[in-house]
Amino acid sequence: MDLAKYIDHTQLKPDTTKQSIVKIVEEAKQHEFASVCVNPHWVSYCYNELKDTPVKVCTVIGFPLGATSTETKIFETNQAIADGATEVDMVINVGELKSNNDAFVEKDIRAVVEAAKGKALTKVIIETSLLTEDEKVRACKLAKNAEADYVKTSTGFSGGGATVEDIRLMRETVGPEMGVKASGGVRDLEQTEAMIEAGATRIGASSGVAIVSGEQGTSDY
């Protein structure tokens, strides 16, 4: 198993410096990770550094709360793609899901999917740590109905990250055709292999180098 191809090498902390972005870009080149996942501000730099490599540029939309307007999420998506992103990880409106406004949640997701269509993959962050089991299932079904490419567990900003149980539930809910991304607190090889065995097809982690080296990472992201 080529673990590097599963990993979105991630740096989303609010105090991220240019130096730390340069570092993850170089690590991504060296290990040929699936992507680097960075905040929108850094997309253009990462694209210019990675455009001649197999490493994709992934960014986040409506991050980390998901509570921006749909129009804002569309604008962010268009700007990210213009800057060179080919994968976007958008956060659902968790409050509307919990208010049983499923039609709004699906429409919000679909708007980003449509903006990205043909240009970028869309991954939908459902923020599992804030949801009941029923809400997790509903969120996954809404993302699937909206024709997103992936469902993703967590932002890493709301406490709690990916669990094997959640990955298994998400995989069972969306079936074999959608991607499932485990993100938040995945720090080592053992955790990564357990997530993949449970159904994850992508791993979001800032500990990518530690994972592929069989070491223990320290970050929550």
Curated annotation (Swiss-Prot):
Keywords: Cytoplasm, Lyase, Schiff base. The keyword Lyase applies. GO terms for cellular component: cytoplasm. It is an enzyme of class 4 (lyase). GO terms for biological process: 2-deoxyribose 1-phosphate catabolic process; carbohydrate catabolic process; deoxyribonucleotide catabolic process. Pfam families: DeoC. GO terms for molecular function: deoxyribose-phosphate aldolase activity. Pathway: Carbohydrate degradation; 2-deoxy-D-ribose 1-phosphate degradation; D-glyceraldehyde 3-phosphate and acetaldehyde from 2-deoxy-alpha-D-ribose 1-phosphate: step 2/2. It catalyses: 2-deoxy-D-ribose 5-phosphate = D-glyceraldehyde 3-phosphate + acetaldehyde. Its EC number is 4.1.2.4. Its main location: cytoplasm. Signal peptide: none annotated. It is found in: Cytoplasm. The keyword Flavoprotein does not apply. The active site is at D89, K152, K181. Transmembrane segments: none annotated. Catalyzes a reversible aldol reaction between acetaldehyde and D-glyceraldehyde 3-phosphate to generate 2-deoxy-D-ribose 5-phosphate. Belongs to the DeoC/FbaB aldolase family. DeoC type 1 subfamily. HAMAP family: DeoC_type1. NCBIfam families: deoC. This is Deoxyribose-phosphate aldolase 1. The gene is deoC1.
